[in-house]
Amino acid sequence: MAEDLSAATSYTEDDFYCPVCQEVLKTPVRTTACQHVFCRKCFLTAMRESGAHCPLCRGNVTRRERACPERALDLENIMRKFSGSCRCCAKQIKFYRMRHHYKSCKKYQDEYGVSSIIPNFQISQDSVGNSNRSETSTSDNTETYQENTSSSGHPTFKCPLCQESNFTRQRLLDHCNSNHLFQIVPVTCPICVSLPWGDPSQITRNFVSHLNQRHQFDYGEFVNLQLDEETQYQTAVEESFQVNI
């Protein structure tokens, strides 16, 4: 399939995955200067939290782009025509239907155990394996995320595979890849649980694989954990009215 895709287009399967959420693109948008592509929601969230720079290469992003990024319509059309393999069950799925497939793919849910989208405080149609979260639970998780922090300001976690503690996200990732790469034991992800949308009852079958797929970046760099999604959305809309078109 990948060979057919490359032969017919200039794209590879990697081009259909967002560098922020590490999932198949949803409503892809493209930066003008560096031509990098992101999910629209991921891009707007990154702009809100990180300023006027591309989330991938730190290239310049215009003020207009920050509010109204350009849709990557060419990529959307390609995603409707070509299929790729589900990363868990290997079933061939049209790229634009991949996220929908994840919602019913048992192997995907057993492997990753959490929502197939970038952080979402209110469960949406793209969520996988999460139950509805109450306001109280969200608040408690946010406080936990803030309290368990290192001197550098980054949250710290305990490894669920050996109980060694005080790891930042990156150190936990490195530790597990070095010491537990082939250890497949059902556990709860401490990073997911600490986040406002985390579900403490959600079990991840392959924790190290989950870390490598889900936690390659610190969510706090892209999302304001003090604000719910609706507040962030409204703020982005208000700011868009101030942009000179």
Swiss-Prot record:
Q: Report the residues modified as Phosphothreonine.
A: T142
Q: Which UniProt keywords apply?
A: Acetylation, Chromosome, DNA damage, DNA repair, DNA-binding, Metal-binding, Phosphoprotein, Repeat, Transferase, Ubl conjugation, Ubl conjugation pathway, Wnt signaling pathway, Zinc, Zinc-finger
Residues in C2HC RNF-type zinc fingers: 86-105
Q: Which catalytic reaction applies to this protein?
A: S-ubiquitinyl-[E2 ubiquitin-conjugating enzyme]-L-cysteine + [acceptor protein]-L-lysine = [E2 ubiquitin-conjugating enzyme]-L-cysteine + N(6)-ubiquitinyl-[acceptor protein]-L-lysine
Zinc finger region(s), C2H2-type: 157-180, 187-215
Q: Tell me which residues bear N-acetylalanine.
A: A2
Going by the record, the broad EC class of this enzyme is transferase
Subcellular localization: Chromosome
Q: Looking at the keywords, is Cell cycle present?
A: no
Q: Where does Zn(2+) bind?
A: C86, C89, H101, C105
Q: Please provide an example of a Pfam family that matches this protein in its UniProt record.
A: zf_C2HC_14
One term under GO cellular component: nucleus
Region named Disordered: 125-154
Molecular function (GO) terms for this protein are: protein kinase binding; single-stranded DNA binding; ubiquitin protein ligase activity; zinc ion binding
ZnF locations on chain (RING-type):
18-58
Alphabetically, which GO biological process terms does the record hold?
cellular response to leukemia inhibitory factor; DNA double-strand break processing involved in repair via single-strand annealing; double-strand break repair via homologous recombination; protein ubiquitination; Wnt signaling pathway
Which residue range or ranges hold the UIM domain?
225-243
Query: EC annotation?
Result: 2.3.2.27
- Is Metal-binding found in the keyword set? yes
UniProt effect for mutating C54A: Catalytic inactive mutant that abolishes ability to promote DNA resection and homologous recombination
Pathways involved: Protein modification; protein ubiquitination
Its domain comment says:
The zinc finger domains (C2H2-type and C2HC-type zinc fingers) bind DNA and mediate recruitment to double-strand break sites. They show strong preference for DNA with 5'- or 3'-single-stranded overhangs, while they do not bind blunt-ended double-stranded DNA or poly(ADP-ribose) (PAR) polymers.
Output this protein's name. E3 ubiquitin-protein ligase RNF138
Species for this entry:
Homo sapiens (Human)
The gene behind this protein is RNF138
